[in-house]
Every structure is written in structure tokens, then in C-alpha cells.
Amino acid sequence: MSESTGIPQGSPAVGAAGSAPAAPGVGGTECSGAAVGSARIAVKKAQLRSSPRPKKLEKLGVYSSCKAEGACKCNGWKSQNPPPTPPPPTPPRAEQPTAVSLMEPCRSCSHALGDHVTHLENVSEEEMNRLLGIVLDVEYLYTCVHKEEDPDTKQVYFSLFKLLRKCILQMGRPVVEALESPPFEKPSIEQGVNNFVQYKFSHLPSKERQTIVELAKMFLNQINYWQLETPSQKRQRAPDDDVAGYKVNYTRWLCYCNVPQFCDSLPRYEATQIFGRIFLRSVFTIMRKQLLEQARQEKDKLPPEKRTLILTHFPKFLSMLEEEVYSHNSPIWSENFMIGLSGGQIPTVVSAPPVNRSLYYSSSPAPVELAGGGSVSPARKTASVLEPNPGGEKRKPAEPLSHEDSKRPRVVGDIPMELINEVMSTITDPTAMLGPETSLLSAHSARDEAARLEERRGVIEFHVIGNSLNQKPNKKILMWLVGLQNVFSHQLPRMPKEYITRLVFDPKHKTLSLIKDGRVIGGICFRMFPTQGFTEIVFCAVTSNEQVKGYGTHLMNHLKEYHIKHEILNFLTYADEYAIGYFKKQGFSKDIKVPKSKYVGYIKDYEGATLMGCELNPCIPYTEFSVIIKKQKEIIKKLIERKQAQIRKVYPGLSCFKEGVRQIAIESIPGIRETGWKPLGKSKELKDPDQLYSTLKNILTQVKSHPNAWPFMEPVKKNEAPGYYQVIRFPMDLKTMSERLKSRYYTTRKLFMADMQRIFTNCREYNPPESEYYKCANLLEKFFYTKIKEAGLIDK
């Protein structure tokens, strides 16, 4: 199970200089020992994880409570021969000390080491290595607690220390709870700066606009590595500012962005993705001042081609951005900001290990290799503050190129973006659309359309609520919970009222409530099981006089988006005979994707009900899904109309059928080729499934054996390429293709070729042209099409 802890507000920053954090508050300036300290942690973890299993058990035993008979209260095994304090320096390449025997008695309780680690007997190496990583994070935070002088900072260190210590004892996963879960503001800083570039510079020529994009990337990256001043320093520097609000964001930044950079057992987020305008306002002034000051100090180190960018364009960029940051009515901070049709967007800023580098941007940075293997992301970045993209990460996203500058090959049959934009401008412009007024809902509108419009007008609201034993009850929430109890009891008459009351008011259960005119008219009661990877839906109902209005669909869509935000992508529920139809419409089926071992013993079984499941796609915005589908249909319809308008010639109807002909070849229809239709070569599509399978298997084997196939063998790992799955909406790899081929998914060559092409297209979309991945994609693509032609699946 996941462990969580509340973090006190206004806690000072955490550093990572040397073996313990540096004093917080030096905004933006990093200590020279930062990278060394983080690298040291990574090396220690690598060494410990490579130790023999007895040594690992000894290390974990120190943090494991005694399980000997007699209810021993010892909370950790202690050696009879404790190491000296401080320990002697370890000589280079020294052999690891021999692990003690499992029969070695504890200095505290006299029970054997084996009595402390009985719960680890059947634990996998992967899980044990995860726990060992937490152990080293605990030891590091312990040092921080003792060396830190600031009481607020010490308190945060101690809170995180206790959280991780508890996770080791209970073999759980740490969850930091500071006020609420990220993101804390919408739109985010990243989106706001992206909007700013579109709002102010979309009219510029491509090359000039690209300069602005580079400056924006530099600025966003700097925020992700900026060291905030402590609340006390903030109070001294700007006593009139909202220090209380600053403390809240400061604590969030500390827990979600700063500490996880060197304690990687904690979840980590980028500041630009979870904070927004309020956070940026609190740091912008001092940040701008120090950025420009360092730029002037390092101007002699800049190459001539970068001096104008850094010394001239960057100050102007910051001045213009400052106006929008502090303006009360700037459109860039609107969630409904419409991105202009021209210009590229700023890609997601991906965090990466820092390297010592000069002020200017290098397009091909070198990675930092560590003795223990891999690379680390320290708490404080030693690179220059104006560095736009610290190097060393795998598969970093390329800078956006405008359509006229892009030389990347397009997917076969892809529609030009200019045409899409032109069609979009038509279907979104009421003056350009002909036909009757559409103020009323059409007969073919989506089920949730009416509910969506009511939500926009403020007629209905959605709130996730639940009972709490830790906080004073909120009167409004308690009233809503009572309302939910009444709705569920009335709509589910066969369910005992006491049972409904117990679950609705159970602190482990939450309810997504639908509020209209201040009262509850529906809701979905659920319980989340994060460690098992699913959520159980317990009750789902809308009051009878409010049904058939799309509320049920919109309610479920909100629940799906809530779970995507919390990274739980599976729903399970027991549906009775009356609810099966509803759940089927919401994407549920009897084909359960969650392994049975994950949910047996966790969810409630109901007699006469059917277990149904739903797997969520994190790429789908469910509350707007029907709108997106509708718009896609309109785009396709307009594209067809344009194609029809281009075909001016009108042919007479076919008369051959009147003469007794039963069927004709499609290609013999007059004018069919002019519409863009292409005949499929007779030898191209293999009709024998076994022959097709054999041919595709042979091609895939040759592709996987190619020397340039190594980057595409398995799915991209999130920790190797942060943000990859936000940039690439439809990932594909050779391992997935092998599994699909084995399951006979590829019933036609087109499906096979589409997946293979997606691998190459995704790679070129995410990586810069000069990268090794980009080159591998081009070479492997050429090899693939050679083999496809040799197999006779396409024309040579």
C-alpha cells in the first residue's frame, strides 16, 4: 500500500551540496558540490544493489521490526559491533565487508537478524532493490536532519524521513501529500509561456520565431532548476508580498520538485508543469534580475553568434513576458486561450542530468557518466543559469520546426497541415458556415452534450468529496454526503441503507458528486487501490427526475479524467442486470484487463451481479471526447467536399448492370482514379493468413536483427525520456509488434506497415535530426522498405 504524510507549510529548501544539503535560500545560484553529492548517492545505490543478497538483508534488517515470537518491540536490527563514528575512509576499489550471518543476534533485543527479515524471504530482487534505494534516501535525510539549522527545514526533512522509514517497515510506496496533488494551477507556467510565444510572436517569419522559441525554452528550463529563497528570506526582501501564499507554493515545490531530485524514491515533477501564474509572479522579479546579472558577467565567455541572443533578445523577451505575468487581464493565462494557426509550440521541457557548460546553448551536449552506471539528476544544477537544455538525457524532443523549414518525411497519405488549418478556420467560424442556426442541440448530438453545456453555464458542478477522520468535518461536504446517501438509497432500493451509509461515509471511499442548484442529484462512489492499479466503483446513480439528460455519461467522463490525473487506469465494478447497459455505453466490458490476483480479496462481490472492467487511455480527454470526434467528422466531411469540388467532370451512371452484369472491377468505373482511389496490386495482399504471417514474421525478424534497430526494441521508458508520452500520442516498438504478430493481429500488410512506420515517425518527431536515434530511424526505415519490396508486398 502507498504511504503518505502531511508536510508542514512554509518549509525551507533542500539542497544537495556534498554529503548534506547546503543552506537554503540562495536563489538560482548552485553550489559546486551539488553534482558530486547527487552522484555519490547514485553510486552508493548502484553498489548496494549489486551486493549479494545476505548483505542486502543485513542492510534492510536495520530498518525492519523484529518478528520473533513474544511481540518483540524492537524496530530495527542493531549490530553487536557498530561501525566507528565517523567511519574510516574507504580506499579505492576496496572489497565490500562480509555480510553477517542471519543468526547474528541484535544488540537491542537479542533476537537473530533472521527474525527481523522474515518478511523478505520471498521478495523479488527488483522489490528489494527498490527498498534499498529508500534506505539510502532515509540515511541521507537523516544526515540532513542533523546538519540543518533552520527549524522549518529540519521539520520537513524529518517528515520525509519518517515517511520513507515507514515505507521500509510496511514495504509501501511513498506518497507525499502537501495540501493537494499536482498540478496546482492551470494553465501551467509551461503552457502560459507557450501561449505568450503564440500571442506575441506568431506573426514573425519562421527563423525569427525560432529564436523566440529557443529563448522560451531557456527560460522554462531555468525555472525547473531555480532554487527558491526561503519564506523568511522572502519576508525580509519583500515584506509587503503574500508570504503565507508563498509558503504554500514553497512547500509544494520543496516536496514535489526539489527533494526528489536526489531522493529518487519520492515522485518528482517539473515546476513548469505543476505551477502557474501565482508561482511565477512570486519568483519572476528576483529571477529576472539574477539571470541578466549573470548574463553580463559571462558575456566574455559567449561566442559571437550567441551574444546578441543572450544580451539583446533575452532581456527584451523577459521584459515583454513580465508585462503578461503581472497583467490582470492577459489572455495567455486563460485556459481557453486559442493557439494561433501559425508558429510552432514549445515542446515539453525535459529534465536531465546537469553538466558543467558555458552560458550559451549547445545543440549536442555530452552525457554525464557515473562510476556506478547510468546518470543522476542532482538537486542543484551546476550548469549556467541561462542554459536552455541540460544534456545527457535519452531521446530528447527536438525543437519545433515550422512547416516550411521541416525536412522530415511525412507519413504516406498525410494531409498537409495548411489544409487542416484552413478547414478548421471554416468550421469554427460561424460566418463561414452555411445552414440553419445551431443554437439548439441537434438530434444527433452526443449523450453528454447537454450536460457539458450546463456545466459551462454553471448550472451543474462536479466535486470529489469524502469523509475524513483527520480534519474537522465541513458542513457543506457532510450535507452533500447525506444527499448522496439518499440518492443511492432511493435509486438502489435492493441495497441495504445501512450498507450504503457505511460506504459513503467510509474515509477510504470517495464520491464524485453531481451538484445542481446546491443539492446533490447524482454521484459515483468509488474506492481507489493505487498499489493494485485499479479503482472499484461501488455505487453509481442519478436521481430519477434528472435522468436521460446525459448526466450519467458526463459524470463517468469526469471520473475517468480524475483517475488519469492520479495515474490509475482501470475501473472494476459489479453491475446488476439494470446497470449493464449503462456501463457498456461508458466503455466497460466483461473482458477484464486487470489480473485476477490483483483484485481478488480487494473488491466486494455481489450476488447476481456481473463483474465488468474499463481500461482508460491517458491520451484521451474524456470530458471533451465527443466534441473532438464531432470536429474530426466535420473536418473529414469538409475535406471530402473539397475533393469533390476539384472533380469537375460528371460521368453518366453505369449501364452495365441493366445488361445482366452482376459485378465489375472497381478500377473500371469511369473517373474512379481521379478521386484519388488506387487499386491494390493483386500480388500485394497475401490472402492466405499463414503465408502472410510467415512473410511478416520473416521481415520483422530481419528488422530486429539490423544493427540500427537497438533503440526501438522495447517501449520507451518514462524515466529515460520524461515527457515522451506527452509528445508521442501513439507509441510503438518492435517488442509490441512481435506480440501483435504472435496474436495474429496483423490480418493485412497495411496494419503491419502502419505500425512499423509509426516507429520511425515517432522517433523523428521526438528527436532532433542530428541525434543518433534519428539516424537509426532513417537507416532502419530504408532497410525495412527494401525487405517489404523483396517480399512483393509493395511495388519495387
UniProtKB/Swiss-Prot annotation:
Residues 81-94 have a biased composition (Pro residues). GO terms for molecular function: diamine N-acetyltransferase activity; histone H3 acetyltransferase activity; histone H3K9 acetyltransferase activity; protein-lysine-acetyltransferase activity. Keywords: Activator, Acyltransferase, Biological rhythms, Bromodomain, Cell cycle, Cytoplasm, Cytoskeleton, Nucleus, Transcription, Transcription regulation, Transferase. One of its GO terms (cellular component) is nucleus. It is found in: Nucleus; Cytoplasm, Cytoskeleton, Microtubule organizing center, Centrosome. Disruption phenotype: Craniofacial cartilage and bone defects, characterized by shortening and hypoplastic nature of the cartilage elements and disruption of the posterior ceratobranchial cartilages. Morpholino knockdown of kat2a and kat2b leads to impaired heart and limb development. Abnormal fin development is also observed. Residues 10-24 have a biased composition (Low complexity). Acetyl-CoA binds at residues 540-542, 547-553, 578-581. The active site is at residue 536. It comes from the Eukaryota. Its EC number is 2.3.1.48, 2.3.1.57. GO terms for biological process: bone morphogenesis; chromatin remodeling; epigenetic regulation of gene expression; heart development; internal peptidyl-lysine acetylation; limb development; negative regulation of centriole replication; negative regulation of rRNA processing. Residues 1-32, 77-97, 371-408 are annotated as: Disordered. PANTHER family: GH11602P (PTHR45750), HISTONE ACETYLTRANSFERASE KAT2B (PTHR45750:SF2). This is Histone acetyltransferase KAT2B. The gene is kat2b.
